Amino acid sequence: MAYLNNSFDEEAQSFGAFCARALLENACAALVGRLDSFRMLYLAEFQAQGAYEYGKPTKSGFKWTGDVFSEDKPLATLWNSDHDSSKVSRALFSPHVDAVLWQPAFNEALDYLADECLSGFEEISTMEAVSFISAAKGRCGPLYSKLSKGVHWDFFVASVMMDEGTLKDAIRDCLTVVSNLAFISHFIPTCYRSLDRAQAATEYLAFRETFQ
């Protein structure tokens, strides 16, 4: 947050993208864990084994493509008795998770905001349930790639390093999409550790005030 709200300096230019991508990844991982607790419990148990190796890639480890974004191409039809259930993605942004969890929750959130006449939710209120997750995917994908260039340090020429506007816009986009997802998640009845709706709204507004 300091890299966004404070004056731009060399430290922000060097580490801002790294911190923002870490936030994006960890926030999405937390949402995966709250929606699919077995996935997190499996990872925790797997990593607790004595054979776990830090320097070796793990096929079952948490992955951006697989846990957040679906690995496979979308199915032509979501609901078909011929689908192999083992191949139905449970990724955070998968079409099935969107249809079963995110879209009903988004409609619940809109109804709550309308009933309570709450302000400060204009961005969410202008969206539609059917496009909420597709919009989040559309922001998270390019954002992840942009921030990754700062993490892996693709900038070998000073002229292409992120300037203040580019970096701060990326950080702001990251905080915005994460806060929107987090707020809607509290309207998913099966989501672990959901806040009371009033508290979720209060926390959302307080968080948004820190960077708007």
Model region roles, listed by residue range:
Residues 122-126, 130-159:
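Histidine-centered, metal-coordinating catalytic motifs and their short helical/loop contexts
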Residues 9-12, 16, 136, 160-163, ...:
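Residue-level recognition of alpha-helical structural elements
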Residues 28-36, 145-159, 179-190:
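Charged/polar positions within long, soluble alpha-helices
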Residues 21, 28-137:
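Short non-catalytic regulatory patches outside canonical folded cores
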Residues 59, 211-212:
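Non-cleavable N-terminal signal-anchor transmembrane helices
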Residues 117, 134-145, 164-211:
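Amphipathic, Lys/Arg-enriched alpha-helical patches that create a basic surface
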Residues 1-39, 147, 175-179:
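Short, hydrophobic, well-ordered secondary-structure elements
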Residues 2, 45, 157:
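Conserved catalytic-core motifs characterized by acidic clusters
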